[in-house]
């Protein structure tokens, strides 16, 4: 997968003596010390991220972790103090205002937590608003807006005023407005955080369905690890302006980088995330059909404290499984050939199936 967005050594400072604060960052001084000496707040410090094309990349952290500040740097709503941002192989940190405007209009779109809609306008004209600003003729912009309306499930609401809609419906308008532009990159800042839990779950599902079809690059910000795990192909966890870990949901749950991440992961329902491949035995004990007799099999089972073992044929082909009680019966009967007790109908799961889906 190609890299779509690259953030290199990015720091964002707010306050008076930025030059002095930058020096102190390079010297490795801590946030508190820099604030005390220069009056500068370090919102983001030395962030490095690579976001792949078509990936749903979640940036997660508590409030004050710098996640929103960082994302607003991608479309330069916030100016970086140090470092660079690259989009599709172009350094956008040094672009002129004119070029930047083109990128914001054509290549990126943003969805906000509190929707950011124009309450006195209808659904249709809210969705077409960005296209209107670009000077696109009415007929064409309304055609695009209608396509976008269909995608997010707002058909029939075109002429309603936005302030008459529920929160979930309003956020659908926000999403449709962002999509009307056909952006390559979608930035979503706590987009579902203001919604009721049930509506929120529904919007997450809809976003995942949309992403299946659209395959956009989405940077999604949240403070909620369950949401991050449900949505993210990969997750970056931020704390105090620094990126502390980047990984797939499973990597973050099974191998947290530090105590901070561990504390976050403690409340998560692992069954929804951990897959068969991460709990399976990587070097399983097997029974070889022509070679192993009851005595050897019982010994293997005792050693590993297992009541059943997989059976393989001469060509390493999986034949089924064998149960301890049946092996004990064979031994009692004095039979050496185990083929009569191999159970061929064995429930199986795919490697990427979650534990929750595996259990009845």
Feature-to-residue mapping (PLM):
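The conserved cystathionine-beta-synthase
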Residues: 286-306, 312-313, 328-360
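Short coil-to-helix segment of the ABC ATPase nucleotide-binding domain corresponding to the Q-loop/switch region
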Residues: 121-128
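Conserved signature/switch motifs of ABC ATPase nucleotide-binding domains
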Residues: 105, 160-163, 181
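Helix-to-loop junction immediately C-terminal to a conserved catalytic motif
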Residues: 75
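Conserved ABC ATPase "signature" region
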Residues: 23-33, 90-91, 128, 132, ...
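Conserved ABC transporter NBD signature motif
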Residues: 83-91
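ABC ATPase "signature
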Residues: 246-247, 255, 321
């Amino acid at each position: 997968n190609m890299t779509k967005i690259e953030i290199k050594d990015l720091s964002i400072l707010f306050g008076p003596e930025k030059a002095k604060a930058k020096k102190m960052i390079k010297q490795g001084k801590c946030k508190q010390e820099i604030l005390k000496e220069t009056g500068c707040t370090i919102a983001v410090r030395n962030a490095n991220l690579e976001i792949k094309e078509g990936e749903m990349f979640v940036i997660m952290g508590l409030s004050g972790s710098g996640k929103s500040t960082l994302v607003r740097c991608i479309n330069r709503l916030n100016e970086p103090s140090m470092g660079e941002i690259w989009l599709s192989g172009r350094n956008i940190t040094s672009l002129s205002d004119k070029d930047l405007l083109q990128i914001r209009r054509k290549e990126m779109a943003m969805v906000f937590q509190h929707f950011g809609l124009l309450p006195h306008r209808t659904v249709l004209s809210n969705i077409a608003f960005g296209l209107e600003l670009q000077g696109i003729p009415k007929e064409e912009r309304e055609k695009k807006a209608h396509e976008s309306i269909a995608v997010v499930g707002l058909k029939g609401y075109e002429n309603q005023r936005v302030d008459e809609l529920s929160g979930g419906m309003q956020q659908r308008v926000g999403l449709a407005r962002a999509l009307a532009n056909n952006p390559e990159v979608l930035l979503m800042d706590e987009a579902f955080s203001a919604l009721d839990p049930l509506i929120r779950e529904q919007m997450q599902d809809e976003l995942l369905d949309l992403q299946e079809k659209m395959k956009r690059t989405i940077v999604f910000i949240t403070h909620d690890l369950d949401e991050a795990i449900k949505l993210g192909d990969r997750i970056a966890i931020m704390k105090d302006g620094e990126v502390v870990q980047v990984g797939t949901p499973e990597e973050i749950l099974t191998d947290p980088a530090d105590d901070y991440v561990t504390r976050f992961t403690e409340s998560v329902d692992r069954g929804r995330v951990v897959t068969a491949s991460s709990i399976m035995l990587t070097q399983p004990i097997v029974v070889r059909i022509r070679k192993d007799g009851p005595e050897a099999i019982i010994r293997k089972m005792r050693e590993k404290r297992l009541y059943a073992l997989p059976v393989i044929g001469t060509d390493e082909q999986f034949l089924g499984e064998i149960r301890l009680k049946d092996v004990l019966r064979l031994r009692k009967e004095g039979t050496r050939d185990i083929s009569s007790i191999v159970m061929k109908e064995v429930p199986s799961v795919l490697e990427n199936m979650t534990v929750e889906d595996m259990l009845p």
